[in-house]
Amino acid sequence: YRRQRQMCIRDSTTVSLIRGVLRGLKDHGYKIGGFNAYATSDVLVGAGLSSSAAFEVVVGTIISGLYNDMKINSVEIAQISQYAENVFFKKPCGLMDQMACSVGGMVNIDFKDPTKPIVKKVPTEFEKYDYSLCIVDTKGDHVDLTDDYAMIPSEMKKVANFLGEDYLRDCDSNEFYIRLDEIREAVGDRPVLRAIHFFNEEHNVKNAVSSLENGKFVEFLDAIRKSGNSSFKYLQNVYTTRDIQHQNISVALALSESLLRNYGVCRVHGGGFAGTCLLYTSDAAD
């Protein structure tokens, strides 16, 4: 699959991202100006592959090079890109996609202070272990799924607020489980399940990073498997409940598990609900 197109000034989506990045750069005190650009990309649009984040970062990097002597660092470009998507594109995304695109490679990010995120590169020599990272296009897209995405942080914050905090990361998981009945009664079961995913995922991420840093690839795969299962069962971002008859990702995951067996792991990729799956496959599976 390959897509080529010349950016059109009448394309409101593209224009909103460009204008948002330029406004953000200007507000941060950087010089801005015009430029002509032609883009060729293999990134699937609306499939959970950070296509909008990648585009925002490209625009920011172009302006950094043309007008600011390439002095705008990758973290600031990511933050400005997020601003463009939140304010101009009207999508309530976090900072993860933009940061991954801007910094590059596999990264571990701590977002406790969004103004000063802690970013650490993680080694990713998959070929060393005879494994490949694959993306499976399930032929769905993210059109009209903004509300589904927005409900995830909204529901998690309901649980955090019940426990007296703004964010789940500041909550005591032991208190959460002790008061589970109260929380279920107050906010409902889906927010509770999504909170359980959050607490699980904090451990999964730490285990995945530690495993890669210490060359324990089997443990890394186990962390990815647990993360994917938690996303499906507790975060519930594999399909939209507004269209239960179309579950492309669910079917793709079922088939992938059946085909891979012990030769790899799979999980939903990106924001979920539609789009792509992520697979780590053993070269021996060929």
Language model: regions and residue ranges:
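ATP-dependent small-molecule kinase catalytic core of the GHMP/sugar-kinase superfamily
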Residues: 65-214
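Glycine- and acidic-rich phosphate- and metal-coordinating loops
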Residues: 22-44
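Phosphate-handling active-site elements
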Residues: 27-35, 63-77, 282
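Single conserved hydrophobic/aromatic residue that forms the stacking wall/gate
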Residues: 1-5, 9, 280-286
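A short glycine/serine-rich beta->alpha loop
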Residues: 10-11, 41-49, 85-90, 194
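Beta-strand segments within the central parallel beta-sheet cores of soluble alpha/beta enzyme folds
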Residues: 34-40, 71-83, 221-226
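DPxDG-like acidic metal-binding loop motif
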Residues: 49-69
